[in-house]
Amino acid sequence: MPLRPLLVLSAVFSACLSSLIGANAKPNIVYILADDLGFPELGCNGSDRYKTPNIDALANSGVRFTRFYTAPLCGPSRALILTGRYAFRSGAVTQDACKTIIRTGEKAEVMIPNVLKKVGYATAMIGKWGQLSPSGDPSQWGFDHDLHFKGSGMYWNSKVAKPMSEGGEVRGDPDTYVLDGKTIKVKDDEYIPDLLHKDATAWLEAHKAGPFFLYYSMSHVHGEILPTPDSAPAQKGESEDAKRKRHYTDNIVYMDKLVGKLVAELDRLKLRENTLIVFMGDNGSAKANAPDATIGGKRIEGEKGSMKEGGGLVPFFATWPGVTPAGKVNANVADASDLLPTFAEVAGAPLPTGRVIDGRSLVSQFK
């Protein structure tokens, strides 16, 4: 196509985007990241086994992607998301390598909250920070507020979790979480996903004047899979495998419930109309759960940690009332590096300079 028509189209699109955003030139952004949730584990993606009515309704209100990819492991995926740069640039090529991401000096990486804060956004990270911790806590990467935990799949404290877990094993540090730099003990009656949700909704209430960026890094559905507060008691004669599968389903159902409650809170606060919500999984299904993650009786080859399709293909959708058409399915290829430039365009923020940003804004794909 000749250059002149391209320039005209670009100008028209920019004008359309400005009018869609409206008088409130800085929309809010809520980014929901599910842990170890593979593409076939949502009802809207055709899951045979799992029912996710709240997430499905949210997906159907916007644009759902069917070929969205990320790194197949938690740490590298989250580094890719937050920096918009591939691992060979950031150094986050493995879980352990994530601790070496450079935070200060000329070669420092720049993350999404740093970009958005420059144009007036309040920023919060609530949930799993994981392998990025050695490189600095969320507050050191531009988040005004953070609540993160170190339980790695143990969502009750060790006293409560030990009798529930296989072999009585307790992983990570489920007994504490960190709230704005202060380490706090998890009480016996506290369920980490509920604690995260409570903090997220309180933060939304406090920052409803906007604009804000909430990175809601959910704990579900990372293993070890333990009962949720809604799980039924053990069934007589139930095998360990059957119990594990039932509890995994319970965890997906509970995650779906929390997403529904978060959206309801945005509605209650009258924030939904001016908020872009993006939902995504951080990598494919965990190996133990991948065989049950089928669509039409077939599984996607590969799982978390694998370079096959199922390792990096993840659920992804975006919804923004008045901007994203309801029920649209997008089959274009996109990946997690696209989030930083997408959020920057939505916020009207310049991209970081002096570095290569591998991602490209998806805003035009949301139409």
Q: Which residues are covered by each model-predicted region?
A:
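Bacterial N-terminal signal peptides
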Residues: L7-S19
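N-terminal secretory signal peptides that target proteins for export/translocation
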Residues: M1-L3
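Formylglycine-dependent sulfatase
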Residues: I21-K367
